[in-house]
Regions:
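Acidic, low-complexity intrinsically disordered regions
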Residues: 1-183
Length: 183
């Protein structure tokens, strides 16, 4: 996560990025949308991996918050493109309000709007590609990675490159769904 923030801060487009950060195993976000230079970097005190992840509930909650904020920006005349990337082991533990089908319905609506890019990174080997498909995330926007520290660093570097490329309009939102992680 820190590598992602650093890459965005170092990009020429840093002033055009807002970053919201949620952990799927927490009730509250680390922070809502801030300029990337103000985004919180994680350390051993602020981030505690593990615990139960209500993946479907948190994905819908996070996307709903993004939709609301993006609409506020649009209403004020700001052009907005939203890129949401979930990094997960693909397991849902404890979702009580939403199912994978609910996620897929929301994903379809957002992708059809052509103002959203949705992507998933799966860490480890837990069948997350099927989960991503069930949640409506296009196959070209799904990345499989190991779960070692070097794998995780590589993933954040690739995510940051993909976000920067998408923000520079080198790919349009529709095609980004099919090749988000392709350089």
């Amino acid at each position: 996560q820190n590598a992602l923030i650093e890459a965005l801060v170092d990009s020429k487009q840093k002033d055009s990025f807002l970053l919201g950060m949620w952990a799927l195993n927490r009730d509250n976000p680390y922070h809502s949308y801030l300029k990337v230079v103000d985004a919180e970097k994680l350390d051993n005190k602020s981030y505690h991996p593990g615990g139960c992840t209500p993946l479907y509930d948190k994905w819908v909650e996070t996307l709903s918050a993004n939709v609301t904020y993006a609409q506020q920006l649009r209403d004020s005349g700001t052009t907005v493109r939203s890129i949401a990337v979930v990094i997960t082991d693909g397991q849902d533990y404890g979702s009580r309000q939403h199912t994978a089908a609910d996620c897929a319905t929301l994903a379809k609506d957002l992708l059809d709007s052509e103002t959203f890019v949705l992507a998933m990174v799966g860490l480890g080997n837990h069948g997350f590609k099927d989960v991503a498909k069930d949640m409506g995330i296009p196959a070209g926007a799904v990345l499989e990675a190991g779960d070692t520290p070097s794998d995780v660093r590589r993933v954040f570097q690739l995510v940051s490159q993909s976000v920067i490329r998408a923000s520079q309009a080198k790919v349009n939102p529709k095609s980004a769904q099919n090749n988000f992680f392709t350089p």
